[in-house]
Amino acid sequence: MSKIIKVIGREIIDSRGYPTVEAEVHLLGGIIGRASSPSGISIGSREAHEVRDRDNSRFLGEGVTKAVKSINNKISKSLISKNAQKQKDIDQIMINLDGTKNKSNLGANAILAVSLANAKAASKIKNIPLYKHISEINNTPGIFSMPLPMINIINGGKHTNNNIDIQEFMIQPIGAKSIKQAIQMGSEIFHNLGKILNEKGMSTSIGDEGGYSPNLKSNSNAFVLIKEAVKRSKYHIGRDITFAIDCAASEFFEESTQSYYLKSENNFFSSYEFVLFLKKLTEEYPILSIEDGLHENDWEGFSMLTNYLGNKIQLVGDDLFTTNPKFLKYGIKKGIANSILIKPNQIGSLTETLEVIKIAKKYGYATIISHRSGETEDVTIADLSVGTSSGQIKTGSMSRSDRTAKYNRLIRIEEELGSNAIFHGKMEIKNQFIYSNNNLKNF
């Protein structure tokens, strides 16, 4: 019953209106697993390669028919008659078939879609939810926890076309007692922020990840608006809600001057100066998490940032580590950052994703499961966060169904687990105890 009889690839549309890859894995007996691959817009240079057609006669060159063809021919032929329950073997077959270090032959978008579709098919064979199947192949059967969300409510950077440099301004509902309550808190603050922006005559248009994208006087102005929305929602800054940011600093790093240019500040910063800029923000606002605070290759700058803030707040590597064991191990060896963003399409298979999560946990790095700016209705990352007890999830705002689908999946999982739905909330944030005791009372 676990034997693969057919693998199908197709081109579908993602949340930005661009093509992406969807795959189906068909098993003997009629079981079908279906999954799709997301796509980023601010892409780390070390990410696994996403194969695009680059044929300008269709979809502005963004088509994925080459990746789909790889699924329908090479991948399908190599997986026929294989056992879907052996996820590691399935993924290794595709990795070997690709034959490159960054999956540039078949494409990480093709391999990941099939990898996830296979896991879904395997879970159906066992008649268990995907998160339970993931916990089993992760060798942590029966161990689950609900993630604390990072809820994106203001978009900047490459996720929209406003004048804000920092890519994501997020809230974390640390006062919540369940994922359902955390989502409620995020929704209320999101809608109150929209009302405040409207009252001030600011744009309430939304960016790629569902957050508002107004033009602001400065990056700091975003925090002021969010604080106002939190208070209007009758929550307390520091006690109920803390902040998180994704700088995506590689996007405003200028190679020619080797400096960081913030257009909203109209100023250039050296690595050291930008570290001090971030440090000051954490002193002025309850920021418990900073992602990609420096350029992906600015290891020296990241080392400085870690020295200043690494024992106080959560420092997350996204472009820095790209869900890659090699770069995570290097960061661990050098004592850089203390957390990692987990994006399955950065590495290109479920097996490799689980490997990176294990390494991070072994060395005390927090893990945050993440979406991409180009998403679909696929909710696999919700199951991944629960099945690996990763502790935190980053899946956008309280608008756009490609984002809310993941939140809704988490609500259903929590309901299904009942009294076994463990939600650690605030405790999942790296170094939150140290920071909370010394700083949050000031806000």
Swiss-Prot record:
GO molecular function: magnesium ion binding; phosphopyruvate hydratase activity
InterPro entries per record: Enolase, Enolase-like_C_sf, Enolase-like_N, Enolase_C, Enolase_CS, Enolase_N
Catalytic activity: (2R)-2-phosphoglycerate = phosphoenolpyruvate + H2O
Subcellular localization(s) per the UniProt record: Cytoplasm; Secreted; Cell surface
Keywords per UniProt: Cytoplasm, Glycolysis, Lyase, Magnesium, Metal-binding, Secreted
Pfam families documented for this protein: Enolase_C, Enolase_N
GO cellular component, one term: phosphopyruvate hydratase complex
Recorded family membership: Belongs to the enolase family.
Associated pathway: Carbohydrate degradation; glycolysis; pyruvate from D-glyceraldehyde 3-phosphate: step 4/5
Residue sites binding Mg(2+) per the record: D246, E291, D318
GO biological process terms, semicolon-separated: glycolytic process
Full protein name: Enolase
Assembly mode: Component of the RNA degradosome, a multiprotein complex involved in RNA processing and mRNA degradation.
EC number per UniProt: 4.2.1.11
EC category: lyase
Binding site for (2R)-2-phosphoglycerate: Q167, K343, R372, S373, K394
Domain of life according to the entry: Bacteria
Residues of the active site: E209 (proton donor), K343 (proton acceptor)
Function: Catalyzes the reversible conversion of 2-phosphoglycerate (2-PG) into phosphoenolpyruvate (PEP). It is essential for the degradation of carbohydrates via glycolysis.
Cofactor binding mode and count: Binds a second Mg(2+) ion via substrate during catalysis.
Names of the cofactor(s): Mg(2+)
UniProt cross-references to PROSITE patterns, sorted A to Z: ENOLASE
